[in-house]
Amino acid sequence: MAQPKKKTSNAKRDQRRATWKRKARVQAEKALALGKSILSGNNTGFYYPQLEAEEEEQAEE
């Protein structure tokens, strides 16, 4: 017969939670670095969609 499963220990739970938070922190740091490079104008290694207002201003000049 099927037996009830054992409760996950607090240490295992904390370990999984720490891994999840670590991955989230790394993604947040990457997003912040990307945003900073776009705002500072140091974005040479990637492409991102331009706003329509910026395109209209460039077309008028």
From Swiss-Prot:
<comment type="similarity">
    <text>Belongs to the bacterial ribosomal protein bL32 family.</text>
</comment>
<feature type="compositionally biased region" description="Basic residues">
    <location>
        <begin position="1"/>
        <end position="10"/>
    </location>
</feature>
<dbReference type="Pfam" id="PF01783">
    <property type="entry name" value="Ribosomal_L32p"/>
</dbReference>
<dbReference type="InterPro" id="IPR002677">
    <property type="entry name" value="Ribosomal_bL32"/>
</dbReference>
<dbReference type="GO" id="GO:0003735">
    <property type="term" value="F:structural constituent of ribosome"/>
</dbReference>
<dbReference type="GO" id="GO:0015934">
    <property type="term" value="C:large ribosomal subunit"/>
</dbReference>
<protein>
    <recommendedName>
        <fullName>Large ribosomal subunit protein bL32</fullName>
    </recommendedName>
</protein>
<dbReference type="GO" id="GO:0006412">
    <property type="term" value="P:translation"/>
</dbReference>
<feature type="region of interest" description="Disordered">
    <location>
        <begin position="1"/>
        <end position="23"/>
    </location>
</feature>
<dbReference type="InterPro" id="IPR044958">
    <property type="entry name" value="Ribosomal_bL32_plant/cyanobact"/>
</dbReference>
<keyword id="KW-0687">Ribonucleoprotein</keyword>
<keyword id="KW-0689">Ribosomal protein</keyword>
